[in-house]
């Protein structure tokens, strides 16, 4: 099945925003998303490298903003 990977990435980013938490390294989110989407988000500079032993991933400043925008667009009521 063909699908729009940009839409998948936007939804993955919005879901990362849903489980966002702050620690001493900044905004982090649990990385239980499809690896392909996580790799694309990393290539776009929106998250840190997901290939680590950590169970969470760091969002860049740009990624944090994009995640909130995607979350509000996809999941909030009008």
Whereabouts are the PLM-identified features?
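Residue-level detector of intrinsically disordered, flexible termini
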Residues: 10-13, 53, 66-69
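Short, amphipathic alpha-helical interaction segments positioned at domain boundaries
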Residues: 61-78
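Generic leucine side-chain signal with a strong bias for well-ordered alpha-helical environments
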Residues: 13-16, 46, 59
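Short amphipathic alpha-helical interface segments
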Residues: 1-35, 72-77
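A short, conserved structural fragment
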Residues: 43-52
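Amphipathic alpha-helical interface surfaces
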Residues: 34-37, 67
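Minor-groove-contacting beta-hairpin "wing" of winged helix-turn-helix DNA-binding domains
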Residues: 54-60
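Alpha-helical DNA-recognition elements
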Residues: 40
